[in-house]
């Protein structure tokens, strides 16, 4: 028996398509078999004893049973008898028909005779079998295979199953025909009933439609009448309203004309009153100006008398001025000669700096200090800067020695620097007592809200200004002070601390002579950015400029936890090579000291630059008289 045929047999038995067979499935398929036969078949096919027959178990067990019977030359009934020996029925087990010691060959004839008799007794009852089923060919093939398999019991049971199945199919066929006849009669009756209902519904719809149309006509007619009446009432009301509005408009026009006339009169009256007040005020001012003119006229008369007295004195001074102008011309000529000599000596200085030993042997000079050597080396690079300094220094303060050799004029810096800023000459920071001899450009820089503008106001006005607006761009201030007996003009450039103005600040750093870097001792973030500010200043300037680091708002240090300590600021200044001081713009502490320290540093740097180019500043104070001093002061 082939595998597809066995699979077809399994699918016929598995009507619910579960994939396995149970005892109940076999009982439904083979209702003619008793429980012993079903148990025998189920035990044969359930090889793993799981209580259900899988598809693979069914295929393998069925084919193995058929092949085993064919290989031993036994038919189906003989194989069943051989299996029954291993597991005999209850009535055979009770009678103990076979002896366990007997030979298997002696027992086989008895079993075969018993089964053959049982086969013939059951096959006689199923002589007439009808195989007219829907799958007749498959059933016939299966029937032939069962006949050839030599299992009469299965053949008889198969015949019974096919017979019962055919009988049930016949009954179902008759039942189906009966149901079809009933369905046809019911359908015909239903169609007649539906036709009657459709006719009734059509009649009802026609009546309802006619009634609705009539009601709609009546309603529309009534609404038209109501709308016509309402429109006539509204038209009459609108005519009345128009008449009232026209009357009110005329009344308003008359009222507006009257009000406009009154307004014109009031405006004219106001203009006249204002003109009258202006005339009175002008009259009072004229009286006041007249009195002031009279007093000024008297003062002018007094001044005229004084000027006449001074004129005679100035005539005497004119001769002195002529002599002084002649001396100035001589000094200018000397300066021109000195400048020419400086140009000539700059070339020799470059060679001298490269061969320091030869210069020292030539002039028998002692070894200069590192600071002086660096200043002399920078003098060559900053010659153009030094020539500009000549213009800012008063002419009477510049002296040249005609009898001194050129080399002694240039290399006299060591001796002149020894006398610079001696303790006896330091006089502090005071108000200026004359015109400025020097001018320094100082840039105020630092983060926003650290007190730069308050610092500047304390320097300029000597007072603290509260609630200053934020600086936008740059604010310029000028303060002339007297430092150690010299009048110095300090140009303070107050720059904005916001990040967006940083590029603008860099352009002012390039032209600055010094810088005041301010941080807030109560704001650690502003202190942390000090290093960046110093690097920005050094990158923006072409030469090294004096810088002072100022820690502002020390008056708030006690009330603010986590403020920057003074030692931290001093350490930062020492590491960056700048000056350091803590101040308070509120009470003015150390403001003047900070400005004094920076100004002295600026003056010292400028003195070194000037001396390195061969020009010596004369500390003598200018004479009070003279045309040149007056022109310089103006």
UniProtKB/Swiss-Prot annotation:
A GO MF term: calcium ion binding
Which keywords describe this protein according to UniProt? Calcium, Coiled coil, Cytoplasm, GTP-binding, Metal-binding, Nucleotide-binding, Repeat
According to its UniProt entry, the protein's GO biological process terms are: vesicle-mediated transport
Q: Which residues form a coiled coil?
A: 169-310
* Top-level lineage group: Eukaryota
Has keyword Zinc?
Answer: no
Q: Which residues form the propeptide?
A: 632-634
Residues that coordinate or bind Ca(2+): 46, 48, 50, 52, 57
Q: Where is the EF-hand domain?
A: 5-33, 33-68
Q: Where is this region: Disordered?
A: 212-234
CDD domains, sorted? Rab
Q: Where in the cell is it found?
A: Cytoplasm, Perinuclear region
Residues binding GTP, per UniProt: 449-454, 552-555, 585-586
Signal peptide segment: none
GO CC annotation: perinuclear region of cytoplasm
Family named by the database record: Belongs to the small GTPase superfamily. Rab family.
Q: What is this protein called?
A: Ras and EF-hand domain-containing protein homolog
Q: What species is this protein from?
A: Caenorhabditis elegans
